[in-house]
A protein has these predicted regions:
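Formylglycine-dependent sulfatase
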Residues: 1-459, 464, 473-494, 526-550
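Residues forming the ATP-binding cleft of Hanks-type serine/threonine protein kinase domains
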Residues: 470
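A contiguous, mid-protein "functional segment" used to position or interact
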Residues: 483-522
Length: 550
């Protein structure tokens, strides 16, 4: 391991998409064995209480990349752009002479309106920087390329498949995400009925191995140039379409799934927002046992394939000599209900959706005491940005970054004044359920606060949702209108208000600059004399401030 006094040289920031916290063997899954991810956990720390700032791809990732809550970035759902002046991980690491690149997905939407107003060309260096969330797009691929979106024609992955001899119009769909029928017809992976079939593509040419190789190519290139780097390897899977190539498509069966977590009481007079979400198509599909039993084995196969590729990646890093100086993080942008709580997809705030896997390997000797341990203190996605900055030798701009560095926890410090709660946000304004509920956009926000026992969700225009995870760890019973919990609700509302009023919105002037400001001296030095009665009083003040030296 590296010397304690040294900084981390590189960062490998691995993110899966839609990976549940409990579908890893190191997290207790009895049938889905993930030895390579487990091995990474054995080298580092597995954070067992890690929460995302939003249980949906785009807004979660914007918080991961900025170190800021959704209400600070304004990105409260998919395809809501960041402000062009929003600082990201790439900005902070650039100051440390690190090359920060993307391989895979960000779900970042460029702020084209602001760029046009400011005269920023999209193809310029600054244009690419602000359009790609501060990353250098070594290969940007958000992983969803239906034929109805013509951008697939210029997709680098499709061009790769062409070179491998695959034929068709949209190779991403026709080969990587479709199966073959008995009459040689293409069976689309968009359709859940085909999840049990193998994708047409060879395993080595499918998306997860392809992205792994692309990350290796970048690392080898950067190492050859002697560059410090941060590589964000952002996998597309196990996000839908739920289809995986052989041999992973039939490795698991319905008897190897985790038991579904749901209760009939959840469908009896549910909270209006949760009730509406239960009626969305993905929820009604996965509420059916046969759908869940048919699709989840493919989801598990995608995870197994991912674990195998993590193994290939770790072997490569060892061969490159990078395991001694590279911080490695493995996480996910959110989870997946898969029928739990009568829901599909993610979006809401139960544990399968908002809680994620989080493993951090710190190569320095300062982290030796915590290797192979499980940390139960609550952390948030926004904690990674300050962790990376500090580990790489930088100073966190605390007036901008809202996360907390994990370095004290990685070093095994016990007396750390840590957070009392975690927060997550969601806006269903873009969803069908908004119309069903008769809500206008702008009044569809939801904010969760969880203190380790009570999970409180504020829902605009409705009563709150409250779960007591000590008495009800599976979150079946909503106590949001229970008089016995009135004092708890009042306390949680107070904590939420306090949090909402203390966001970092003054980002253009640092705390240090304000602390250094001496009001009287600054005003007198600028010739401003407010409130003085006569020349004598002014002269005394100027002498005290050091402007008159005798």
């Amino acid at each position: 391991m590296t010397d304690k006094a040294k900084d981390v040289r590189n960062v490998l920031f691995i993110m899966a998409d839609q990976l549940r916290f409990d579908y890893l063997s190191c997290a207790g899954h009895p049938h889905l064995h993930t030895p390579n991810i487990d091995a990474l956990a054995a080298r580092g720390v597995r954070f067992d209480e890690a929460y995302v700032q939003s249980p949906v791809c785009g807004s979660s990732r914007m918080s991961f990349y900025t170190g800021r809550y959704c209400r600070s970035t304004g990105a409260v759902w998919n395809n809501i752009p960041l402000r062009v002046d929003e600082l990201t991980l790439g900005d902070y690491l650039k100051e440390l002479d690190m090359r920060t690149v993307l391989v895979g997905k960000t779900h970042m939407a460029p702020n084209t309106e602001a760029m046009e107003r400011l005269g920023i060309e999209a193809s310029s260096g600054i244009g690419v920087h602000v359009s790609q969330c501060g990353f250098e797009p070594y290969e940007r691929d958000d992983g969803l390329h239906p034929t109805e979106r013509p951008a697939y024609k210029n997709l680098a992955y499709n061009k790769y498949l062409e070179k491998q001899g695959y034929e068709g119009d949209n190779l991403w769909h026709e080969w990587a995400n479709s199966a073959m029928g008995e009459d040689d017809e293409i069976l689309s992976g968009w359709l859940l009925a085909h999840a049990d079939k193998p994708a047409r593509i060879a395993d080595e040419d499918s998306e997860t191995p392809y992205m792994t190789r692309r990350a290796m190519e970048f690392i080898a290139e950067a190492d050859a140039k002697g560059e410090r780097w941060c590589c964000h390897l952002s996998y597309i899977k196990p996000h839908w379409p739920y289809i995986v190539p052989a041999p992973y498509h039939n490795m698991y069966g319905k008897d190897e799934l985790l038991p579904v977590v749901r209760h009939e009481v959840e469908r009896q007079s549910p909270h209006p927002v949760y009730g509406a979400f239960m009626e969305q198509r993905a929820s009604t599909a996965f509420a059916k046992d046969h759908v869940r039993e048919h699709v989840l084995p493919a989801y598990m196969g995608l995870i197994k394939q991912l674990d195998d590729q993590i193994g290939e990646l770790m072997k490569f890093l060892e061969e490159q000599g990078r395991l001694d100086d590279t911080m490695i993080v493995f996480t996910s942008d959110h989870g997946d209900y898969m029928g739990d709580h009568w829901m599909g997809e993610k979006d809401m705030f139960h544990q399968p959706s908002v809680k994620v896997p989080m493993i951090v390997f710190d190569p320095r000797a300062s982290a030796d005491a915590t290797r192979g341990t499980v940390e139960n203190r609550m952390i948030e996605a926004i904690d990674l940005v300050p962790t990376f900055i500090e580990a790489c030798g930088g100073t966190v701009r605390t007036h901008v970054v809202e996360g907390r560095s994990l370095e004290p926890l990685l070093a095994g410090e016990k007396d750390v004044d840590w957070r009392e709660a975690v927060f997550s946000e969601y806006d269903y304004g873009h969803q069908w359920m908004r119309q069903k509920l008769g809500r206008h956009s702008g009044e569809t926000g939801m904010t969760m606060i969880f203190d380790g026992r009570y999970k409180f969700v504020h829902c605009e225009g409705y009563r709150p949702i409250l779960h007591d995870l000590q008495e009800d760890p599976q979150e079946f019973f909503d106590r949001g209108d229970d008089p016995e919990y009135a004092s708890v609700i009042q306390r949680m509302e107070g904590l939420l208000l306090e949090w909402a009023l203390t966001r970092n919105n003054r980002v253009t002037k640092s705390d240090a600059a304000i602390d250094a400001y001496e009001d009287k001296k600054q005003q007198l030095g600028a010739g401003v004399a407010i409130g003085f009665w006569d020349e004598k009083e002014l002269e005394e003040a100027r002498r005290e401030a050091g402007f008159i030296i005798e």
